[in-house]
Amino acid sequence: MRNLLGGKGANLAEMNLIGVPVPPGFTITTEVCNEYFEKGKDAVVALLKDDVEKSIKGVEALMKSKFGDVENPLLVSVRSGARASMPGMMDTILNLGLNDEVVEGLARKTNNPRFAWDSYRRFVQMYGDVVLGMKPVNKEDIDPFEAIIEEVKKAKGVRLDNELDVDDLKTLVVRFKEAVKKQTGQEFPSCAYEQLWGAICAVFDSWMNERAILYRKMEGIPAEWGTAVNVQAMVFGNMGETSATGVCFSRDAATGEDLFNGEYLINAQGEDVVAGIRTPQQITKIGSQRWAELQGISEAERVAKYPSMEEAMPEIYKELDELQTKLENHYHDMQDMEFTVQEGKLWFLQTRNGKRTGAAMVRIAMEMLHQGMIDEKTALMRCEPNKLDELLHPVFDKEELSRARVLTRGLPASPGAACGRIVFFAEDAAEWHNNGHRVVLVRIETSPEDLAGMQAAEGILTARGGMTSHAAVVARGMGKCCVSGAGAINVDYKTRTVEIDGVVLKEGDYISINGTNGYVYAGEIPTQPAKLSGNFAELMELCDKYARLKVRTNADTPRNAQDARGFGAVGIGLCRTEHMFFDDEKIVAMREMILAKDVEGRKKALDKLLPYQKADFKEIFKTMDGLPVNVRLLDPPLHEFVPHDLKGQEEMAQAMGVTVEYIRQRVESLCEHNPMLGHRGCRLGNTYPEITEMQTRAILGAACELKKEGYNPHPEIMVPLIGILYEFEAQEKVIRETAAKLFKEEGVEIPFKVGTMIEVPRAALTADRIASHAEYFSFGTNDLTQMTFGYSRDDIASFLPVYLEKKILKVDPFQVLDQNGVGQLIKMAVAKGRSVRPALKCGICGEHGGEPMSVKFCHKVGLDYVSCSPFRVPIARLAAAQAVIEESL
């Protein structure tokens, strides 16, 4: 049903069936959306015309009113409804069916002229923006409707829209329609059905708007899913003091706490809450008290000015609370609900599974499991692997925080800590981010057009809006830190400054925000790693209960290894030795080895490197005691280590006692036309076996020392970049001969394995021959992808955006494993290798090792483990568990 009716349409139908009060309406299916883009607007309107008019008559009968009628008018809303939730990304039109005559009939019917004209001016503005294309495209453009509203409010001497009287609202309608005629050259449509078809087509068109396309890319939503269109009878929250509108959540979307919460506005329409135009009040008393404490408002003032719905509308609150519980129990998930109260009658406009932060996701899944609402498999499948990343992000350093200057406090809309340079426009946020700057997007309020900037920013700060504003909902969905409703800040877009309690900050100044408690600080505050909850640990234990695939880490330092072990890594799948050479003392010895005139010179330099390497390995083995550590022998081309600047070459010449010219010539001789396919990997080891000998001594020497100290090291030595069996055999011979000598010298023997990286396509094709000698395979999917596609990983950015836009590629193959090409090479190599060595251990150690779809593929083809960066380990563990569960579905 969801695939056909979209999430909103399916949920409305389901709510109706279980007895939740829903305004009548109908849904145009997602299939029609695809036909709309295939056959065109006119063809689809002709096909739908009779069905839509028949459905409108059905709504008229239920509401006992008539669409377009002057005396007893039916007004409708037209909303999008994709299969997956896309909050704010597509378009909505409310109060459709009004014109100059109908508005007078609505005023007479409701005995509320202000409500009628307020609804009309909102409709003209919304229709003008969405259907007639009057919404500003560029950041410097002025919204004609907002400019008119500000002029009228200024002339009247009021601050808020709801302070305008009936005559003011009539003035707005007249001026709005004049603006429509001036900008579009057409009169504003007065025919109700003309308005309806314009709105339906605009919602379909919004499926392909820029922000919707960007959101689909972020969330992995296919374009062919399309959106449904929901046409629903309007109910009004702006009919006076017994009417209201609001958004609520069955649990806290930021923390996951099992606490009903939300916001409402009396005498308002739903868009007012989510757009952040007015800062709303809390639904529950406890929520209101927490809000007041954050704002520094006394209890007496809170009760008098900002009462909760629980206090101001107790009967409505009781019904709302009962129905939200009913909906959560029905869907077995946290619900995000929109509602309207029209003259004392509660209506639900929609419910959906609520967007939530990573922390809330884990807590809700685990607590619902404990409450018996869901089982273990559902709890695991309910968690999105990539969202676990949010739990692992740093928080502000407490000591630095104690010295920081607090500027103001807003609402804690999305948890976490963020600091960066202030920018005021979404385009600038994206541009600054691309230039390597960390930024915080500061806005009066955000809108869906700001999506790209929000994605690029470290965090978002808004002057207006509540916990359910656009900024809050989208930031939580992205896992971005957000502080909203910071009313003390005064944003000036023209001067690109923000004034906070007398302090003026300009674009480019540093600011720090805490989305967990709402505080805003001056300057840049250092961060420290986050502490994980008991729910997280329990989720990880549950992952291990179901997963078959093990998760190792890519780590080159004891700190990285310690982090990964804390996240549950069961070994190191890739320890890159070259990263150990870049300290000041080590790099000099490394350069001496590379630039030496002969073997003796190289050996002399290698003797200097040996103790450094051994000390590094010893610390890593100690950290990973009892777990396997897979060490890759030297891989990059040598030119990456040598100095290319004159100063560096002069220093090397002095250190080695040779001329600068000699150094320059040696450096020049190391440069290659295509270094990634040149003198690197096992080719270095076979050309200079003394390098392999030194590294073997360092690896196994460290293990021997630790064994004597009572530790239990498990070294694995990996030969990189082989394409021919003989390349491996030559390196294995050096390794084993060196090991035999070393063990004799040390008087202790360490079990170790020698394996290889499968990253050259020929190695995958001849894996059966290679497995006759190699004790394990580790697939280096970065280089395997590079060589299979023939794409340079360093240069793909020059054409990848075009390939993605034209759908030549669906995803970046360096981020998501190509299952049809690279994946088939992996599958073939595993089968060939195990045909010779049945117990052959196989894993991957490229960037794909922490990407959920790639992890699931690795499970499918029978790998033993994946290896990824430390902070991706929990993500891979969850994906590995989900892979097992998905097989059984």
Segment roles from a protein language model:
Residues 1, 414-456, 822-839:
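C-terminal accessory/binding modules appended to enzymatic or scaffolding proteins
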Residues 1-404, 412, 437-440, 447-452, ...:
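Nucleotide/phosphate-binding sheet-loop regions of phosphoryl- and nucleotidyl-transfer enzymes
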Residues 26, 463-465, 484-487, 575, ...:
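Short beta->alpha connector loops at strand-helix junctions that form conserved
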Residues 50-54, 218, 380-432, 438-439, ...:
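Long, charged amphipathic helices and adjacent flexible linkers at domain junctions
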Residues 79, 532-535, 542-889:
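Conserved alpha/beta-domain cores
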Residues 250, 430-432, 451, 501-504:
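Short, surface-exposed secondary-structure edge patches
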Residues 458-464, 482, 843:
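A short, small-residue-rich loop immediately preceding and capping a beta-strand
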